[in-house]
Amino acid sequence: MVKAASGYRTSGNAGHRYSTPRHRKKQSAPAWLRHLVVLVVYAGAGVWATWPRFTWLVDGKLPATADVSGFVWNMWWLSHHLGHPGSPFFTSDMAAPTGIHLGFSTLMPLAGWMMAPITLACGPSASFAALTLITPGLLCYVMYRAARLWLNEPGAIVAGAFFGLSSMLLWQDWYHVNIATGSIFLPVTIEAAVRFRRRPHARPAVALGLSIGASVLINQESAVVAAIIATVILVPWLIWGLFTDRALLRQVGTPLMIGAGTGIVVASPELIGAIQAIAAGAAVPPRGVLAANYTQFGVPLPTLFAPSPRLSYLGLGRLASAYSYDNRYEKLEGLPTFGVVLSGMAVLGVASSWRKRSTWAFVALWLVSAALALGTSLTFGNCQISSWRSPGTYWGRTCHQYLPLMAHSYSTRVFVPAGPPAGVWKPVVVSNLMPYTWLVRVPGLAGLREADRFAIAGLIGTAMLAGTAVQWLSKRKWTTPLIVVVIGLGVLEAGWSGAARTSPGYHGVMPTALPRLDHFLSSDHSASIVVDFPYGLRGGVGATGSEFSPAAMLIATQDGHPRAVSYTSWISKVAIAGVAKHAFFRYLYEAERGVILSATDVSRARADLQTIRVGWVLMWRNVWTMHKPRWRYAYIDKYLTAVAFRHVKSACLAAGPLSGCHWNKRVWLYRYEPGAPKKAWREPVPVGSYHQRGQK
């Protein structure tokens, strides 16, 4: 190999040189200070872009969603498990008494371990809130670092802001912090892979392995995307070297092995937990459920480039309505839009730098990710729903779905107006022309069930192109002032402050503690199981039972009692079967569905309770609001009383005295008293019927 000339470095190919001017080193001597200033500015911008989230940290409030309470519980569990033997990827504190595997859940072990000091000092709710506050700044900073590989300082700074402060990512930061935090490692992976291509030594290879391994410990979906990006960056380069530079292949072999080994070692806790979950059946969901998810989360083409709903907070509701975020049929699992400003700047970036090879790499990342985000069909309109979910209700009025090269996937259960209460089984239709249809058929990738999240990877390419446009503007005196205009327009679409109260996406706010109930349960040190009702093993794939109150998992972190409910991304068959073995839970499921129990059923449930350590039941009377909720709650109260529970406490979820509290704003606390005299079971008279699907 020819020795590189002074002032240059090689990548194993003597004819390919990268300049490293010595004067640049002198100018950037205090590089750490510049990076620190950039990071601090980004952190402040992140707090502004998510306002009023910072005030909620002081006020002790959180978004009232099951996902958020699940993240808080995860923080508590990981800090609680530190110093204890056993795997953190299995817990008996959820789905008790059986327990449940967490290998395919949103556990975020790396974030939980890093935030453990705050969790132990201030509590898991404060730790979770702090994580959501620092994530936007980190997203901006890692994007800035990656952009500096190609762009000048102004272009890289703007690219970092467009990425980390986008509504798309900050929506995830509010409600799915695992997605936002996992996205940190996408630009890190790009930076490490490109640095390895430019200088194929052990240091960038180790950085690449650390990035992908750490991503596995945060969010497995992001890790898969990061691995795909690294493969696309490195494999074509290695194949080209196979024919043009064999010495390069000999040079990169050892560093790549070191990097791969580093990634495996870092990710090994999660990988072991995933293997255990696979053995428990957590990775074998019903095919029909996945097929339905594939169609649910595809993004209509206009939505990807629509104005951000953030504009509605600035009085620009007419512009924001193009996205139709407030449509009551919207599947609110994300905010997959690049925005008008960012899309326009990306086009300008292509026009200004179309001769550069890197520009077309960014274009490919943007457009390929956008094509994957479309899902299994090509849809035009201002909604994000699937034709099988609401046939004849909304679809076809403002949304039009096209299925070129249509094919049938697995069958799923469909609920149609005036149809059977149990639904009917119909095949899910997909388009074989869409790339996402083929991606999920690749072995090991079937779990990527939410197509809209691929737009996050496309956001990297879009931000890079926007930064390229800013770089072009910064090189000309007469266009430099336009950068201020670009920043001003970008601010209009940046950030997310939570859904408005009038939006279907508004879930309300919940306090981080309920002292009126906590002291009852905390004073009981028996470690008995608490059953929250409505009851179910909920979350993502394989969920059973009914949705339960988000506050249930929050107060579990206060009293330390195991919970019979669970909230995980994938529910294992072992957990479902283990719960079904217990007559108490089996008949609780049936009573929850409105099935009239017999005296024999109640006797079996009462006998089963004596074999498990259930001590309390919390009846959240604010969850069911439809289909004769008072009769249904009264029926469950009758069942609990018959199996030896006694109502001992009522608390109001709203501010004010209990006497003025509405019935569906209350929580009833029951205590198990096995010595209580038996009550004869009389089958209640059902008051009409209700649709089994509409339990909330």
List the predicted regions and their residue ranges.
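Active-site lumenal/periplasmic loops and adjacent helix-entry segments of GT-C-fold
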Residues: 53-150, 155-185, 314-330, 398-399, ...
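Extracytoplasmic
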Residues: 286, 351, 488-696
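Hydrophobic alpha-helical membrane-interfacial segments at the cytosolic entry of transmembrane helices
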Residues: 34-43, 210, 234, 247-272, ...
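Membrane-embedded helix bundles of polyisoprenyl
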Residues: 42-48, 131-149, 154-241, 255-271, ...
